[in-house]
Amino acid sequence: MSDEALIRLAEAAGLSIDWIDADNREQRVEPAVLREVLACLGLAAETDADIDASLEILAHKNNHGGVPPLLTCDQHAALDLSAYFPAASRFELQAEDGGVQQGTLDYQARLPAIDAPGYYRLTIDKHQLTVAIAPLSCPTVAQIAGADAWGLTAQLYSLRRAGDGGLGDTQALESMVSNAAAHGADALGISPVHAMFSAHINQYSPYSPSSRLFFNVLHAAPGAILGERPLRQAIETCGLGEELERLERLDLIDWPAVAQSRQRLLRQLFDDFSKGGNPLQVDFDSFRANGGEALENHCRFEVLHTHLRNAQGHTQHWSDWPSEYRDPASPAVDAFAREHADEVSYHAFGQWLMARGLERAQVAARSAGMRIGLISDLAVGADGGGSQAWSRQAELLASLSVGAPPDIMNRDGQNWGISAFSPWGLQQNGFRAYIEMLRANLAHAGGMRIDHVLGLKRLWVVPAGADPKRGVYLNFPFDDMLRLLCLEAWRHQAVILGEDLGTIPHGLRDVLAARGILGMRVLLFEQHDGHFQTPAQYPAQALATSTTHDIPTLTGWWRGHDIDWRIKVGQVPESDRDAQWRAREKERAGLNRALCEYSGKNPDVLLSAEDAVDAAICFLAHTPAPLVLVPVEDALGLEEQTNMPGIVETHPNWRRRYPGDSATLLDSPASSRRLASFAQARRNHRGAAHR
């Protein structure tokens, strides 16, 4: 078998044979890796005959079986339909408001330009399809929030309030947005709130969800929706008072214990609610009806996943279930759902509480004066064994895992254990799964952060369980996905932030910026060999921030606390401690020089950690970034970081809680001073820039 034939198949399948790594070196994927990934895509490539057969499969997939269910186009641009219809074909175009336009395609078989963004129903020669007309750009921060916008980022699970039972919830989030707004913030970015597995309580990373279409019900605050009296009664009935108080006192979240107690409590609340007579029943019924098939399938999955355990009591991947349950549309699944209708309704009840809680938090944010409000966080993928993969099997690739090639931060690469969309599945199904995901994550927010925004164009995919180095980039229908993102952002009047760190293809940042999608610049990364960029060197097409959840806090970095942690967990040998410290001292001296103008201190003297945090936040205020986001950890001067990538057991990832009640979290003298100085500097700098 020739490598030439293999490469032809790989390229036809959307795989990038050649790529540029983080060190700007050209790389080529090994033939063996290509064959492994192609096999996971259902394309055999062991022999020339295999390749010929696989090319025929691709030809059929790419043909979509005729006219595709959805096409995208920019507003003010003609849509080329020559691949599907002859010139001068008669058409009828129906807008979402019911308005109808009739006409003929031009001599090049193009549909005349449409000015108004939206979804249109196009009929030609008895064929019907949807045409998505996208605005040229997402709403910009300047359009939504003005010229001096800034906000904070917080981990939802870390928030505290009296009676929270050991985990941050939407009621604490309401208090947090009010507290942040009181200090002048326009936005609060939060960690992902995607649905997890109710039957797999040890999986709690918010970036490894069961579904990005629904919510983690453990963050629901039922008392805020149903009332405190029903909540107290349910706690008493369950005998959970002492346990909830114990969990609330912990410094680190005990996720399994929290999940057990909250699920018991939610079930009791549902049972009480279901007795009838609750005026909120109408709202719940409406929510469930509007959720449609997607909500029903998620709830059915949760019940099936709980019931279908193996002999050892471990939950199973849905692909290992009895065959009659692997298809969500099967008669067996319908029968199971009818038999367990009460349990299915219970899971819908939890989703209702979460949706209403997030809605309340966004209303509270805007009412308190935030111009953007909540910024949701969209994880790059979902667990291949989860409800989204089960219910959207034609649109997700469950046999491949998303990750990242070796780069500056992770020299061994990364395998995130989550599945990606199928490029062909999306196109063949009218991008249904993608659109519904965008809508779910924009429904209760004024903005959305897209984790690893590179995934709109390409994703590093690895066979499940394989070494992350043995992967390849899989390309996606980028233009279509970008247009749909712009359209949904426009419909929701939301700003879009794209996390563009790591290995980025040349020119991608410019394309995203032209579409109004803000990139991200992190203070600790904006340097070369200890020489940090000045605020003026930051781009005006990206947000600026001090740190992220995957790297040290400013205080922790300044003190070298992260070095101690890396040695403690075995990422770095003890013998490298001195070298690590020397490198850090060089970088710290460079940042100290960069901050001297904003510290008011002698530039020849090393700043204290507290003064460095003050100066760093003031530094960010002077960048031309249209939006600056300050992590709550840095606003408070905390030392510990949220997550250490690649570490599971030896560092408390996703378990840390903030030191005070959300209603007053930012009101300490140090954080109040820090935020007041930052807000004033932001106003002054942006005002000067526009004079």
Q: Which residues make up each language-model segment?
A:
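Short, well-ordered coil/turn segments that N-cap beta-strands
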Residues: 148-150, 184-186, 368-372, 444-446, ...
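Hydrophobic faces of well-ordered beta-strands that scaffold small-molecule active sites
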Residues: 150-154, 188-190, 372-376, 448, ...
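Active-site-adjacent "subsite" loops/lids of carbohydrate-active enzymes
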Residues: 217-218, 384-432
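Acidic/aromatic-lined carbohydrate-recognition and catalytic surfaces
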Residues: 42-76, 80, 86, 94-105, ...
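Low-complexity, glycine/alanine/valine/leucine- and proline-rich hydrophobic stretches
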Residues: 636-668, 672
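Active-site-proximal helices and loops of the catalytic beta/alpha 8
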Residues: 362-363, 381, 385-408, 462-568
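Active-site-proximal loop/turn and secondary-structure-junction residues that shape catalytic pockets
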Residues: 158, 194, 378-384, 454-456, ...
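Conserved alpha/beta catalytic core and glycan-binding cleft of carbohydrate-active enzymes
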Residues: 271, 280-283, 500-639
